[in-house]
C-alpha cells in the first residue's frame, strides 16, 4: 500500500519538514543526496494565510508544538494524508488523515 501511495502521488511536504530533513545531523553523504532528490521531487508548501490560520486553530485546540502544528495544518489546508511515524502527536486532530508507513503491513 505504501508503494502505491508513493508511486501514485507527487510527494508534498511542509516547509518545516524540508527544514527538518536538511538539518539531519547524522545524515551521510548518500542520505543528503536522497533527501535533496526527495525535496526536488516534492511540492514544498510555504506558509500562507490558509496554513497560518489552520496552524493557530490547531495550536489552540490541541496544544501541539509549533512545527507539528504547521505540518498538520499544511496537510489539512491542502487536503492531504499525513504520512508520519509520529502518529501519536497527530491522530487526535479532527479531519486529519494520518498513516504510519511502518505499520501498513502489520
Predicted regions mapped to residue ranges:
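Acidic, PIN/NYN-like endoribonuclease modules and their adjacent C-terminal/linker elements
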Residues: 72, 76-106
Amino acid at each position: 500500500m505504501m508503494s502505491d501511495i508513493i508511486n501514485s502521488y507527487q510527494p508534498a511536504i511542509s516547509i518545516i519538514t524540508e527544514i527538518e530533513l536538511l538539518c539531519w545531523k547524522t545524515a551521510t553523504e548518500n542520505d543528503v543526496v536522497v533527501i535533496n532528490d526527495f525535496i526536488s521531487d516534492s511540492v514544498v508548501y510555504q506558509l500562507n494565510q490558509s496554513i497560518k490560520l489552520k496552524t493557530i486553530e490547531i495550536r489552540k485546540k490541541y496544544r501541539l508544538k509549533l512545527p507539528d502544528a504547521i505540518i498538520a495544518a499544511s496537510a489539512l489546508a491542502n487536503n492531504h494524508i499525513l504520512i508520519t511515524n509520529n502518529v501519536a502527536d497527530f491522530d487526535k486532530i479532527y479531519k486529519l488523515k494520518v498513516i504510519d508507513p511502518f505499520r501498513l503491513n502489520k
